[in-house]
Curated annotation (Swiss-Prot):
Record's protein name: Cap-specific mRNA (nucleoside-2'-O-)-methyltransferase
Keyword S-adenosyl-L-methionine included in the entry's annotation: yes
The protein's Enzyme Commission number: 2.1.1.57
Residues at the active site: K180
The species this protein was found in: Autographa californica nuclear polyhedrosis virus
Length: 262
């Protein structure tokens, strides 16, 4: 029922022009301008609440271009070893020069320089450089779903699964991660996330204040990677936490559409 309501509202947004939606969204949800980019602010808010980016010696930034998650983490840990992987054939995704040129930042792109985490050669290079070595892995990847918002969960499934596998390869025991997720209505999505969180002592689903409340973006924050995973069933708890954010999103989508109708 919640899924149907959300999909109907998302479809409703498509009846308005992109310019109108952007203006209404900014009016409703954007706070006064700040000098920090939104992605920086999101990780800063996550860190202030959960303290995952402090005292980091080595971290990996997955699908992180243009690099604000990496930038924030390096600002707190100026002497750390930082690794980043992002697509190089998309100008939106590449790391900006202020990140790329940092002496302690290494970009992993694979032999063909693609930076594609689905490429086995890129995965191999990541595992060689970062395997079992990272205190923190950040995974902020997403697939462009413009015009196909109701398919966002399905379109991002493979990427999120790939990121979870790389997180488990690269985190040392005791390490933490921040993983962007979207909806989890489908059985395969919730089962994938259930299997993943069993590798950690604790986990929580969170939407930072700078993440626009009408979208489906949330972050799964996992603490203290285990040497041996649990065999717990967290499906009900995952569904409960997701439902809380579905209801918040529903409320804010209604606000957005009501404003657009004026």
């Amino acid at each position: 029922m919640l899924q149907q309501k959300l999909n109907k509202l998302k479809d409703g947004l498509n009846t308005f022009s992109s310019k109108s939606v952007v203006c209404a969204r900014s009016k409703l949800f954007d706070k006064r301008p700040t000098r920090r980019p939104r992605c920086w602010r999101k990780l800063s808010e996550i860190d202030k609440k959960f303290h995952v980016c402090r005292h980091v010696d080595t971290f990996l930034d997955l699908c992180g271009g243009p690099g604000e998650f990496a930038n924030y983490t390096m600002s707190l840990n100026p002497l750390c070893k930082a690794y980043g992987v992002t697509l190089t054939n998309n100008s939106v995704c590449v790391y900006k020069p202020t990140v790329r040129k940092r002496k302690n930042f290494t970009t992993i792109t694979g032999p063909d320089k693609s930076g594609d985490v689905f490429d086995k050669n890129v995965v191999f290079e990541i595992s060689i450089k970062c395997g079992n070595a990272c205190d923190l892995v950040l995974a902020d990847g997403s697939v462009d779903v413009n015009g196909r918002e109701n398919e966002q969960e399905r379109l991002n499934f493979d990427l999120i699964m790939c990121e979870t596998q790389l997180i488990l390869i690269c985190l040392r025991p005791g390490g933490n991660c921040v993983l962007k997720v979207f909806d989890a209505f489908e059985h395969e999505t919730i089962q994938m996330l259930n299997k993943f969180v069993n590798h950690f002592e604790k986990w929580v689903l969170y939407k930072p204040p700078s993440s626009r409340p009408a979208n489906s973006e949330r972050y799964l924050i996992c603490f203290n990677k285990l040497v041996r995973p649990y065999c717990n069933n967290y499906v009900n708890e995952l569904e409960k936490q997701f439902e809380k954010y579905y209801r918040i999103q529903l409320k804010n989508l209604n606000k957005l559409i009501n404003l657009l109708k004026i």
